[in-house]
Structures are given as structure tokens and as C-alpha cells.
């Protein structure tokens, strides 16, 4: 069982005509790096675009002191950070658009595009997918945005959007696998 994880200490949800908003926060790196992490997500009302902003920040005086000490003692230009977006094994992912985006092809034929604001390095790396009922993990990939947090606040913006030429109604569910209502 995986138990080494940060605990989400704040969660806010709201729905607007433009879409749904979700805010999450944890202070999982406060003790070691003086950084807390928040993620703002906005899902468009038509479901075709997810916009995210991840913020790593030293917010309290104690966090700022810890972050400064880490930077000074290590003579660092910044603390190494990585945002990881794990993909399902059935998703075919490829770096696209001159290294500025990742194209994601689903079994259904849907194409989605992951983009970022350019403040970090974009890469695809190996990962594993843990599935209930399977004894062994399945090999997969993850999108990684990596860089340095060199200030008290570092923001990284990204989007996951359905490609324009993909029809609205396609779904990757196999109708034969869906349960039949009784």
C-alpha cells in the first residue's frame, strides 16, 4: 500500500456557467523545502478544456526562512521541482509542436493536447499504472514539467484540451463492457 503522500488540507469546489472550478492545497514540502503546493483547476462547461495553475510558495515566515536557508546553504539557483501527470497505459503520447506540447491519442480516436506556459521543461518519462485486480503494475508514461523554484512563489500554468478536429461525442468506453441496467 502506498502511504507516503501529502495530505490535502484545503479543497474548494464551485460551479459557474463557464465551467467547474476546483482548488486543492497541501503543505507536504513545508518541513523539508519551505514550500506548500496549490493547484487551481478550471474545467470548461463543454468538457473540452482543463486549465491548471500549480503554485509552489513559501507563505509563512517559517517557510520563507526554511526556503532561504535551503537556497543559501546549498548555493542553489532554485529548488528542483517536477509536476507529474501519469497517463493510462492505453493512451499513446508523443512530444509535439516542436517540444512545446504532448499529443495524447485515446483508443476511441479522440486526440487531446497538453500544453504548458513555457516556464518549465516538458518531457515524457516512464511510469507504472496500478490497477485493482492486477498483481503486476502496467508500464505507462507520464508527462513531466520540471524546473527550478527560485523565488518565494513559482507558478506553472498548463492546459489539457481536446483537439479541434475531434468530434464532441466520441467516448472511449466500449459499449459491450458497460454494465446493463436492470
Q: Where do the protein language model's features map onto the residues?
A:
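CBM-like, beta-strand-rich accessory domains located in the C-terminal region of large
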Residues: 1-182
